[in-house]
A protein has these predicted regions:
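PLP-dependent aminotransferase-class I/II
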Residues: 37-73, 77-82, 86-94
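Active-site-proximal loop->helix
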Residues: 28-38
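Short, small-residue-biased leader/transition segments that mark boundaries at the very start
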Residues: 2-9
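Active-site C-terminal subdomain of aminotransferase-like
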Residues: 74-81, 86, 123-222
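General beta-strand structural signal in soluble alpha/beta enzymes
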Residues: 19-20, 44, 69, 77, ...
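Alpha-helical scaffolding segments of alpha/beta enzyme cores, especially the outer helices
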Residues: 59, 90-101, 126, 201, ...
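Catalytic PLP-binding core of fold-type I/II PLP enzymes
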Residues: 87-118
Length: 222
């Protein structure tokens, strides 16, 4: 995910990526986003139950515009979030409108994207390109693949030199076909959604069992 953010949306060293304090790129990548972008900064935006808000994003974008401060270039949001919550279509489009109005691109960390589509019972396009997302890292391992994620560009211009950035970042395997082939079976007949619905059902079953324990409650509604 850290390299997908860099590879899909090249960011200048003086640029900044907006995320929230629990975002995977912030807490679980050992500074890799900054490393792969030669020094760009992660700016933390307020969030509500693990979700960015358009108001919070706007506050960070407009906080400072002087040359002494990193220039916001990208907003990255995670669907489903690290806390198990979901962005609905209106929430994604609201954030995207703010970003686009100020010249920022929108990146989606879709490690659990299949779970979100299954839970929201919507078309994948409704919460991606139709809502203003420029690129998504479409998660494969959490759908059951042994390895591999797929980067999809909805803004085609961003992908013009993707192969070079991918190669430079060490993401071009000598046997790439072995990473690519499992996707054919995963996407056939909506297997990815079948797996996601099953995973969601098991998560709901676990949540219900925990909630039934005296004194136990779920941290967030998911």
């Amino acid at each position: 995910r850290h390299s997908s953010l860099h590879d899909a949306l090249p960011i200048s060293p003086y640029g900044a990526v907006l995320c929230h304090e629990s975002a995977h790129v912030q807490v679980d990548e050992c500074g890799a986003p900054e490393f792969f972008s030669s020094g760009s900064k992660l700016l933390l935006s307020p969030h509500r139950q693990g979700k960015l808000t358009s108001a919070g994003v706007l506050e960070v974008i407009t906080r400072r515009t002087d040359i002494h401060y990193p220039r916001p270039k990208v907003v990255t949001l995670t669907q489903s979030t690290e806390l198990g919550t979901l962005y609905h279509k209106g929430e994604v489009s609201s954030i995207a409108r703010v970003a686009q109005a100020h010249g920022l691109k929108v990146h989606m960390d879709g490690a659990r994207f299949a779970n979100a589509v299954a839970a929201l019972n919507c078309a994948p396009a409704d919460i991606t390109w139709r809502a203003g997302v420029d690129a998504i890292c479409f998660g494969g391992t959490k759908m059951g693949l042994p390895v591999g994620e797929a980067i999809l560009f909805f803004n085609r211009e961003l992908g013009e030199e993707f192969s070079y950035r991918c190669k430079q970042a060490g993401q071009l395997a000598s046997k790439m076909r072995y990473l690519s082939a499992p996707w054919l079976a995963m996407l056939k007949d909506d297997n990815w959604l079948h797996h996601a619905r099953h995973a969601n059902a098991m998560a709901r079953r676990l949540a219900d069992k925990i909630s039934a324990i005296d004194g136990a409650e779920m941290l967030l509604p998911t």
